[in-house]
Amino acid sequence: MSLIANPKVSDWLEFHPSGELSIHTGKVDIGQHISSALVLIAAEELNIKPNQISLSPIQTGSSPNEGYTVGSQSMQHSGYAIKKAAATARNVLTAQAAKYFDVPVEQIRIEDGHLIVDKTNQSISYWELTKDGQLECDVDETANAKNHSKHELQGRYHVSREMLDIVTGRHEFIQDLKLPSMLHARVIRPPQYHSTLIELDEKLLDKFAAEKIHLVRDGSFLAVAAANEYSAVK
């Protein structure tokens, strides 16, 4: 499902000149640590260190559209897509390195994101081969993932990057955030998914304005926002 809506490698992976990689997902980490799992998948397939990878903040307008984060489907959808995107990127960049050095693909090995010609000191990195940071080719779903017998990260002991902050109390949950001029909001749920907002009660709008409650409308999406949470809930 995820690859149908987001078929390009660049929808999932972005190489940065600094030697880092961003991975994109449409799944939200709400405590299940999917972010750590997705980082490990990409790191395993691309032979780079997990600390070289960051998960891009999820944004409606730019992140892959993967629908809801429900039903334990994040690995099935986003995990699969990132694995295939990473395997495709590895194959494409290995082929480019082989062409660059004029050697067979079989003579290229990968260590920490560097494509090295066997028995030589010749090497080139993923980041040198992707100077604009993007791979605009389609994800190849037939690209073979790394054989599990060669896994160096998956299935092995790994502490997720945010775990230390969680167990020591330094981690900030969304309920802990207090920002300047922050508003609390509640979405007004329609009776069914395909409902269309036809009109709004003008008297209700006047009442909201008098109580300094903001109404947010985008098409059939409707929400209220207020300076305190109780007013928004009420």
Question: What do the PLM-derived regions correspond to, one by one?
Answer:
Residues 1-234:
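Cofactor-binding beta-sheet edge motifs in enzyme active sites
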